[in-house]
Design a protein with these regions (language model features):
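Short helix-capping/linker turns of helical repeat alpha-solenoids
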Residues: 14-16, 46-48, 78-80, 110-113, ...
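Conserved alpha-helical positions within TPR/SEL1-like repeat arrays
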Residues: 18-25, 50-57, 82-89, 132
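TPR/TPR-like (Sel1-like) alpha-helical repeat modules
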Residues: 76-79, 97-115, 135
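Terminal, low-structured helical/coil segments at or just beyond the last alpha-helical repeat
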Residues: 111-148
Length: 148
């Protein structure tokens, strides 16, 4: 593990974005949240959408919703299905059902449009959960009564 960490750091120093992401993941798995945030942020700055989503997850767990939604939205803008789902969750939690449904629909669109993504994101579970959220919202909320 120390050897892996050293190799990844050398690659990251050469601006290798996947190495930065992996360092963030490695630090997260070891419970080193500040290191994890640092490496995820570096990868996110270079456009790595899963790093953006994971960084947002950390901010969310810390109670920093402002930073969390900022990074979820950045990743969602690049069609990251996990981030799209998380933005949908954010809006659902804030009772903005119309916008939540739009984001959940985008998840399904991305998964349909890019079937290879299913492998990368274990997206069959994501697809099922997204459909469940949409069905729940359709069944339990009157869209006309919602604010945008």
């Amino acid at each position: 593990t120390r050897e892996v960490d050293t190799r990844l750091k050398k690659a990251a120093e050469k601006d290798h974005v996947v190495a930065m992401y992996e360092l963030g993941l490695f630090a997260f798995e070891q419970g080193r949240m500040e290191d994890s945030k640092k490496w995820y942020a570096k990868a996110a700055e270079r456009g790595h959408t899963t790093a953006m989503n994971n960084l947002a997850n950390i901010y969310s767990k810390e109670g920093n919703e402002k930073e969390a939604i900022k990074f979820y939205l950045k990743a969602a803008e690049k069609s990251n299905p996990l981030a799209l789902f998380n933005v949908g969750n954010y809006y659902e939690g804030n009772k903005n059902i119309k916008v939540a449904k739009q984001y959940y629909s985008k998840v399904l669109h991305v998964l349909k449009e890019y079937p290879d993504i299913l492998k990368e994101y274990s997206a069959s579970d994501l697809e099922t959960e997204t459909m469940n959220r949409l069905l729940y919202l359709e069944k339990n909320f009157d869209e006309d009564a919602e604010t945008e």
